[in-house]
Amino acid sequence: MTSHSGKPRKVIPITPVASEPTLKGETISSLYEAQKKIYPRSISGVFARWRWVMVVFTQLVFYGLPWLEWGQRQMVLFDLGARRFYIFSLVLYPQDFIYLTALLIISALSLFLFTAVAGRLWCGFACPQTVYTEIFMWIEHKIEGDRSARVRLDSSGWTFEKIWKKTVKQSLWVVFSVWTGFTFVGYFIPIRQLGVELMALQGGWQIFWVVFYGFATYGNAGFLREQVCKYMCPYARFQSAMFDKDTLIVTYDENRGEPRGPRIKKVDYKANGLGDCIDCTLCVQVCPVGIDIREGLQYECIGCGLCVDACNNVMDKMSYPRGLIRFSTQNGVAQGWTQSQILRRVMRPRVLIYSGVLVVLCVTMLASLISRTPLKVDIVRDRAALSRIVAGGKLENIYRLQIMNATETPQRYRIEARGLQGIAVASEPEIEIDAAQSRWVAVRLQIPYGSAAAGSHTVEFDISALAGGARLTEKSVFLVPR
């Protein structure tokens, strides 16, 4: 072959390469493959009951707390406008940000600990995405029926039955979602006040946030569901860094179950070369994320244990031992360990270190909260007049004190000073501050002229509540001119 210029063209050899064979159970999916809807089957069992226990417990706490009162206020309220967090008897201010930092550290460390011990325990039983998806699926099951009925309904035409069932289901989802959004906003705005404003169609931002969080609940729990766990949640991606071969996870005993296949109950399946797995696929049908646990550990698995319940029910019907699918460790399955041997390996150095650090942090934070003084003081020197001589032969320094009353009742405080001979408070020694308010106060300290050498001297301010209890000491500097 030649080009237009008459020179021979260079031919690039192309050698076809055969694609590598996939491993057993491995599938290749396109990035742009259409998402297939999952229809989880209902199942009964130990882990299914525990999931509902957690659903009821978490939702009783979530929906109930905003309606409980503590004195004249809401028991739990994060008042961003007033910059105060009310948690039972505690009132936290921006100055208490250290407690929020400590809480976040404790939460992260707890997640690391639970993951090291039992994998995605949080995801399977307490994560809001899991909890609300379970509630939405319960509504769907009650109206449209179990898995096979829902599949038939979705594949059928728009009959009267399909229209009314879909309408009722979507209506209940919307009502529940709006109620969830209303409750969530009620943690930041007093919920009774919020209810009155919404009934009167007042408060544009309040309505916006209720609708926003309601829509988020509706979309995540009603439609996205397992896609949040598989693609949007970062925890699924970095969990492998916290797993090891002694982490309790949902496992399939391949040595016992393979080769899988259907069989007649009373026939000796072992003589036919079969394992305990009858390949009924119930473990796949009940999975809320639609994976096949028999293909090994997958990042999509949320550790809910529903496949364990399904498999145990089948094993009971076949008169086989339970535990073909069970919570175990990779080492436990490979070595054939007993439950006690597995649990002993679970309490490994990594877990003990996490536990020790977590206990220390919790005890430290609790002790700090218990010993926390409901009084805060900041001292700023008056730079306009660092030191001056006043009538009576006194040397005077002026300070500005910001005193915060961190209680929920008005308080009267006494200001005293010590640290130098003859030092006294020349300004009003007592002030009154309203509940949960702060006040700037000008304080004049005086000493006899000549009673202290030239230079700076450390003095201490003692601020105490006349009603008793709160007392705080802060240091500052008294300047004596040369």
Task: Please describe what each predicted stretch is.
Residues I403-T407:
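Asparagine-centered strand-capping/turn motif at beta-strand->loop junctions
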Residues E408-G422:
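Short acidic, flexible loop segments centered on an aromatic residue
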